[in-house]
Amino acid sequence: MPPLKVHAPYEPRGDQPQAIAQLVNGLNSGLVHQTLLGATGTGKTHTIARVIEQVQRPTLVMAHNKTLAAQLYAEFKEFFPENAVGYFVSYYDAYTPEAYVPSKDLYIEKEAQINEEIDRLRHEATQALFTRSDVIIVASVSAIYGLGSPTDYGQVALKLKTGEIRNRDKVLRTLIDLQFERNDLDFHRGTFRVRGDTLEIFPANAESAFRIEMWGDEIERMVEVDPLTGEILTQKDHIEVFPAKHFIPNADKMQAAIGDIRLELEQQLAHLEGEGKVLEAARLKQRTLYDLEIMEELGYCSGIENYSRHMDRRSEGQTPWTLLDYFPDDFLLVIDESHISVPQIRGMFNGDRSRKQTLVDFGFRLPSALDNRPLMFDEFSKHVHQAIYVSATPGVYEYQHHEQVVEQIIRPTGLLDPMVEVRRTRGQIDDLLGEIKRRVDTGSRVLVTTLTKRMAEDLTDYLKEMGVRTQYLHSDVDTIERIDILRDLRLGVFDVLVGINLLREGLDLPEVSLVAILDADKAGFLRSESSLVQIIGRAARHIDGTVLMYADTITPAMDYAISETRRRRQIQERYNQQHGIEPKGIVKAVRDLTEGMKKVAEKPAAYQTAANPDSMTKEELFKVINALEKQMKQAAKDLEFEKAALLRDQLTEMRQTLALIDNTALLESVNRKPRAKAAMVVEDTGKRKVKGRSRGKL
């Protein structure tokens, strides 16, 4: 495997060289807990990348939300293009957990919508940990939630080599055991299909498929192919196919688990009936016996994760398997924005436990469901071999446990921390409006943070009435829309972004020159020392960065944030004078922020249909045909087959129009190849097309 190697157009500068050296020395000397106290815009991610390069160890980078994790994933992919950089977050686009509300006698069934691309990336991440040592995984708090046993997942992989003798039926049975489904019509991730002596497998972690050609029981040839077009991409001497799901039920374990579940059911029924909970006992019996019947028939059931303790053969209260168990013992842990991430990790267990305890008490689940849970913080801590906590405002835990704090205050660009000014609240909106107009006239952007949703909505409406292009970012906005809003802000689609608690950590917005903090003197976590420092940091990437605090008194939190910002500004000024550095604003392409994020959570795009072909020239027809062909393939890839069929029909109409033009050479160059591709789209919808005869309609 290639070594972990950073590819960057610049070398470490400012405080980065000494920070890298201190962190590496700390790791080499065995320090378990280190903190990188880095100001906004000082290149903390670059520093961590250089540390990883020097220690050459598999690394887990944890962030506190999907958006920040996606941003880090994109950055590490750029820093380590030759290495395996994975992304592991919750794969739910929409998720409603199973719950029961006793006061309303309301049972809420679990509902989940899985994002296929994130699921693929999760498999890609875990498989990289079994096949490579040059691995960096960027994860959210999902890393501490239950996952299948790494032993079951890693040791059962199907390995095939060209030229070896393998019984085809046994290979197919192995694929079934690995949770692959046979589907000769709809070929997608986690399925395989058989055509004569040819077996095709679509791995759960891949965007391409494997084609295995056999002569009897001999593997004659293996190739990697495009699953849509069938185009051969590369020849393979050997392949390794990992399970299609992270939970792999073993036949022997399944039977033992079913026996244990029946025994637990009997015990819990006796307990409930002894307390006079007849309704709860009847409910539990009906639900559990139904699940057992499905499991005996199919080897799987909805909500099988609630029986994971029995499936994994764990004892009551035993630590569940998580992503952390997939790493080697000496892995490096990096926790980004640790002042938020650490409390989040600490709180996951209690929130999950409370909800499930209610389900158990009222007969919806067996007590063993409580062991389908995230790690307790003590359990998480036991997995930590060596950790680096990264934050501009480290929390209590970091200060209590650190063995070394490394400061990174100086920015390589010479940019100074923003000027902070406190203004009275009287007439604050009119004052803010004037400041916004001045900033908009210079082509920069503005962030405004409020304390309440009502105030944010009213302010957004008022600014729009005043002719200011304004958008409101709130907690109901999903990940994709949030990314779009941030991109539009950077592109100048609008100029002012108003929010509450969403304008703090991790937002990389170099175009923002003004941050306005309304009600800065109100007590609470939204105006705490760390919150104010983080909000101020949003203006630290612009050469004219300014922060306006609207308040009638200066609170201790405000005083600390202003003093700390002033201290950092003075340090940067001295450094700039000593080295003759002229501050320069950060210039970062918009794609740097958004492309990596949207890749991991992209919704199917809208497909454009063509105009009237009769009104087009020959050259225009060629362009439209090529464009429609690409859209048709993308629609089929997104399983939008109705749209693919519509585009196919339009392609047919285009080609008929083109046929009227007496240029046979051009006609053949366009018409021959696209027809073959159109057939592939038809084939992927599950309708065979043989020798010009169509069996079934799309």
UniProtKB/Swiss-Prot annotation:
Residues 428-594 form the Helicase C-terminal domain. It is found in: Cytoplasm. Residues 25-183 form the Helicase ATP-binding domain. GO terms for molecular function: ATP binding; ATP hydrolysis activity; DNA binding; excinuclease ABC activity; helicase activity. One of its GO terms (cellular component) is cytoplasm. It comes from the Bacteria. A motif (Beta-hairpin) lies at residues 91-114. Residues 622-657 form the UVR domain. GO terms for biological process: nucleotide-excision repair; SOS response. Keywords: ATP-binding, Cytoplasm, DNA damage, DNA excision, DNA repair, Excision nuclease, Helicase, Hydrolase, Nucleotide-binding, SOS response. It holds the Pfam family ResIII. The keyword S-adenosyl-L-methionine does not apply. ATP binds at G38, A39, T40, G41, T42, G43, K44, T45. Forms a heterotetramer with UvrA during the search for lesions. Interacts with UvrC in an incision complex. The UvrABC repair system catalyzes the recognition and processing of DNA lesions. A damage recognition complex composed of 2 UvrA and 2 UvrB subunits scans DNA for abnormalities. Upon binding of the UvrA(2)B(2) complex to a putative damaged site, the DNA wraps around one UvrB monomer. DNA wrap is dependent on ATP binding by UvrB and probably causes local melting of the DNA helix, facilitating insertion of UvrB beta-hairpin between the DNA strands. Then UvrB probes one DNA strand for the presence of a lesion. The beta-hairpin motif is involved in DNA binding. HAMAP family: UvrB. Belongs to the UvrB family. This is UvrABC system protein B. It comes from Herpetosiphon aurantiacus (strain ATCC 23779 / DSM 785 / 114-95).
